[in-house]
């Protein structure tokens, strides 16, 4: 009997264990049922009844499931967490890295209560975190929900928990975290990459075991709490990219400093100086204080004691004084970036000691003087040297040739002289050599071409002599070659055609002769451009007018404040605008042909090669001030991306090819001072450009010059000359005949004048009566849509002319505007917005214009209004609604615009009911509208002087002309209103709900990246057919949040407008279109593309895939 009882109990135990294992297997199979895709066969073994042998499953000694790890399995479908609730022994759950495995955040409360560790990072988790979900799991210590699409707030979630590690980085969570209470057990807290606001929680000082604190990329404000310095074991402190103020707490250099390895406070508004107490941080490897307002000198003691530091990032501050010699003590220092400060004095002679680890030395945009120390060659690992915009003088030390690892040597705008050292040819890894704007002379050493990996060579504005060496043809990776403004002579070597990666060629202002090589436009594109120019920050400084030669220049702009350009003497004399900055142009890696070609200010002769028309992405072509002959090739009309075309001051003949009408991106053309003839093509943009750009061609006619019909034909002129040369009749007969004619003419003229005077007087009386009636109705307000403010003095001004920018409206008066709108009646009202009401006016000749009546403001005066009008009136582009004129009378301000017959995109897309209007816009039409609106906004950002931030980009400000071409409207309005009214809050000028970027709610500081966000919302409207705000559709969120949530859930197709046919190539285009739109509406401005990049992406949307070699 004693033996039977244990056997019976054992049998019962085995039976219950087996039953429990079967329950675990059933739970896992229920979970598997919701997984629709398993491309890697992760769950293929989940078939036999024993779950402990299944992949990703770990069991205890009793055969119960304790761990489920399906990380990076490529699973797709839905993670049904409720199915796992029966796994009551499950301690660890890892579903990370399954981006298409969607998890409802609300299900986080349905997991087994025994859970210790939870990792759902990099997955499809979306929604709000349930209140108190951590309290459901008393043993839970480690939670990682990073890089998902979580929303909602954090406060209260960490209460009553034993959490040791909590990571919700890279989500869309928000709310004020100032008052959140944190558990004393906390060791790792990562809230980075969200939208949290408020101050850094003071409760952090109670987390004595905290080792990692990452609050970067949020909207936190206030000072860094002094109490953080009391956390003895803190290893990582990252509060970068917030709005923090105050100084770096000196307390960080006390208790916390003993273990601190990473200190990041960059991209805030931190002030004060670098505390000397940081000299105690012997373990510090990364010190990042960049992009703040830190001032004072670099404490010598700090650099002398940070022997473990590897990265010293102090750029973009106001740090002054000289660079301490003690930097040589930082034996482990790999990256030293002190860009954009006020560091002065000479570089320490012992900056580099033998065996130093230094790889990057960046000191651009400072006040460093003296010579370059030859001892830099001791830093044998140096890859990057950047000393741009300083006061260095003397020659480049030939000892730099010993730096065999050197990849970038950038020293533009200094006072360097001497020659380019031939020893640099030993730097076989050299990719970038930028020495422009110095006093370097001599020829280009042939040894330099041993550096066959060169990608960017810029020697512009020096005193280089000799010829352009044919050895440049060896450089198959050469993408940028700038040799402008030197004394180079001879011919352009045809071997440049072998530079199969060449994108940017600027040889302007030299003494070059001969013809333009035909191979230049024909031999490009045979080498893939992968990796070329990667890591470079580019800026194109474009010259305006003729104060400086050439179109402009491409600069390496990393670590340089844009305003510093204004202080560069050689640039200060130029009228310039910074046209483009950012990463390498995306089109380069796709098409592999020249984008920029400037050969102006030379002595080139011969004809313009037809082959230049094969450069499909060419944006700038400047051949001005040469001795070119022949005709402008019609093939250049194939350059659909061409923005600048200048062939002025040559000897060209013939006409302007009609193919130029297709150049929709053209914003500047100058063909003046040639021998061209014929009519200027009236299609496209050529007729809208200034007449001065066609001057000096006596044979040219048509808008914007005199109409061709106004010129007498040659035969007529010959006939008049012949008549003038015939013999006169006898004198007496002529006198008798003339007397009779004169008498008749005088009598007729007198009668005609009397009749005309009577008619004019009668017409004036009728007009006066009509004007008085109109004025009365305007002031009564009974027939009008608005309230008018006209004093008695303005009654006499109803005949005032409208100041116009178009010839056909030269004689338009205010009275005619009243008549054309029936007294600005409600029937003529076609729209209203934040800046005023818009009326349709039908003029006497049947043409229509749109009239915007600005809101009444406390105007500062007429000068500001007229100055803004003159600026806006000169802005002309195919994709902008042109301002035709303006009228000022009393307190009224009227703007006259070209009328857009198809109304706004908002009306066309949404109609009156909030859904797509009928007939629905096709996908091709939507793409066309997106491209046009992008070009218009891009023009405002980069081509207008001064640049214009729209501030209210939305679908109602995208108008459609008769050809359904998009025109951006209301540009410049926010700036005009703010210039006229001193009492208008900036917040009222910052956009329309649904289009306003999140950063505007924090600072109200409008930027071009804010416009990009608003444009991204317009793209989402085109894609979804939905308005940006609709409580029925989106509840408490908006279109942007709704689309992000759907895409995060893997349901991106559900957001597409039902009116669109999604199939074939269109489906792929829509996916790319959505990806581009989501880039535009990224919460972080720095992650959004600029409009130049958006235009390029839209252009590539329709581009055929690049041809492959056979």
Swiss-Prot record:
Record's keyword annotation contains Kinase: yes
Reaction equations catalysed: L-seryl-[protein] + ATP = O-phospho-L-seryl-[protein] + ADP + H(+); L-threonyl-[protein] + ATP = O-phospho-L-threonyl-[protein] + ADP + H(+)
A GO biological-process term: hormone-mediated signaling pathway
Binding site residues for brassinolide: 580
Its membrane topology: Single-pass type I membrane protein
Group of enzyme by EC: transferase
Top-level taxon: Eukaryota
LRR repeat feature ranges: 87-110, 112-136, 137-161, 163-183, 184-207, 209-231, 232-255, 257-281, 283-305, 306-330, 332-354, 356-379, 381-403, 405-427, 428-451, 453-474, 475-499, 501-523, 591-615, 616-639, 641-662, 663-688
Active site: 952
EC number: 2.7.11.1
Sequence intervals crossing the membrane: 741-761
Glycosylation sites: 94, 139, 149, 172, 214, 269, 293, 305, 378, 450, 485, 498, 627, 662, 675
Gene3D superfamilies, per the entry: 3.30.1490.310, Phosphorylase Kinase, domain 1, Ribonuclease Inhibitor, Transferase(Phosphotransferase) domain 1
InterPro entries: BRI1_island_dom, Kinase-like_dom_sf, Leu-rich_rpt, Leu-rich_rpt_typical-subtyp, LRR_dom_sf, LRR_N_plant-typ, Plant_RL_S/T_kinase, Prot_kinase_dom
Protein name: Brassinosteroid LRR receptor kinase BRL2
Native species: Oryza sativa subsp. japonica
Gene: BRL2
